[in-house]
């Protein structure tokens, strides 16, 4: 059995902490937003395996796994929040004074939207990325399944080209102010593919090299943080080149001393 990569567990934990801080009015939220959610898209791609798409049975198992891990938690969590919406208002848990009580019709409509992945609740607004990650994972797997008989390099080139095309489509739509539901599927697909290739071609380095990478990544992020931003939830970013800083942010998170520390 392949040994569990504890370093990636730590990195996932760091990502979760950054998301919590980002939604808790932490002073450096703008800095975290440059890369905190991207970590999860990259990690999802990092753990994608060829065995998931070697035949129809494996592909079906992979899809069911994603339904279990992404779709079901999203639906259950948000439906609970819909049902408790009026209770939350009475308990004054919302800071929005204009938040409305739900009628029976409102509850039904919102539950249907949640089941169809077409909306979530204010209380669990941070779960917006789960549908995006779900569809990216499925689309990536379907494409890999379709090209599974091609040579390894050919498959990699196809995915790289598609990633760039998807990013271009997303960017054009944004520039034309066409903010479609789920448009982040186009713009975040490239991160999933990056994670996959990072796992394939990862290079082991010592603590000195990791420290150098950490410092360089941090400096780049600090500089970019002064001149622009990224808001994946709204699919907004200063420039398409700012996607580079998301990958730099991943390197920054991965090369810090916490993730470089080897647990016994």
Regions found by a protein language model. Give the residues of each.
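Cytoplasmic juxtamembrane interface segments
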Residues: 48-66, 71, 181-182, 240-243, ...
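Structural signal for the C-terminal ends of transmembrane alpha-helices
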Residues: 48-56, 86, 142-151, 173-174, ...
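Hydrophobic alpha-helical membrane-embedded or membrane-associated segments
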Residues: 38, 69-73, 77, 163, ...
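Loop-centered beta-sheet repeat module
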Residues: 159-200
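Alpha-helical transmembrane segments and terminal signal-anchor/GPI-anchor hydrophobic tails
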Residues: 174, 187, 203-264
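Membrane-cytosol interface segments of multi-pass membrane proteins
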Residues: 1-167, 176, 211
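Hydrophobic core segments of transmembrane alpha-helices in multi-pass, intramembrane catalytic enzymes
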Residues: 34-42, 131-137, 183-192, 241-250
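Hydrophobic alpha-helical segments of polytopic membrane proteins
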Residues: 147-162, 194-220
């Amino acid at each position: 059995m392949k040994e569990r990569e504890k370093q990636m567990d730590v990195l996932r934990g760091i990502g979760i902490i950054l998301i919590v801080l980002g939604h808790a009015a932490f002073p450096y939220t703008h800095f975290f937003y440059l890369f905190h959610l991207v970590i999860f898209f990259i990690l999802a791609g990092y753990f994608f395996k060829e065995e998931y798409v070697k035949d129809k049975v494996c592909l079906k198992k992979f899809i069911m796994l994603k339904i279990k891990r992404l779709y079901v938690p999203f639906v259950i969590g948000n439906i609970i929040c819909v049902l408790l919406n009026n209770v939350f208002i009475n308990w004054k848990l919302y800071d929005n004074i204009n938040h409305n009580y739900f009628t029976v019709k409102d509850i039904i409509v919102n539950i249907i939207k949640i089941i169809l992945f077409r909306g979530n609740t204010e209380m669990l607004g941070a779960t917006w990325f789960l549908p995006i990650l779900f569809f990216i994972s499925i689309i990536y797997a379907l494409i890999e399944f379709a090209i599974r008989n091609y040579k390894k390099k050919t498959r990699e080139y196809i995915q790289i080209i598609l990633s760039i095309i998807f990013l271009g489509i997303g960017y054009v739509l944004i520039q034309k102010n066409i903010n479609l539901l789920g448009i982040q599927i186009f713009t975040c697909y490239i991160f999933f593919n990056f994670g996959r290739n990072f796992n394939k071609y990862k290079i082991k380095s010592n603590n000195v090299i990791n420290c150098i990478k950490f410092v360089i990544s941090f400096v780049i992020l600090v500089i970019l943080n002064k001149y622009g931003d990224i808001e994946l939830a709204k699919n907004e970013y200063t420039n398409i080149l700012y996607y580079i800083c998301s990958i730099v942010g991943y390197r920054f998170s991965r090369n810090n001393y916490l993730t470089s520390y080897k647990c016994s």
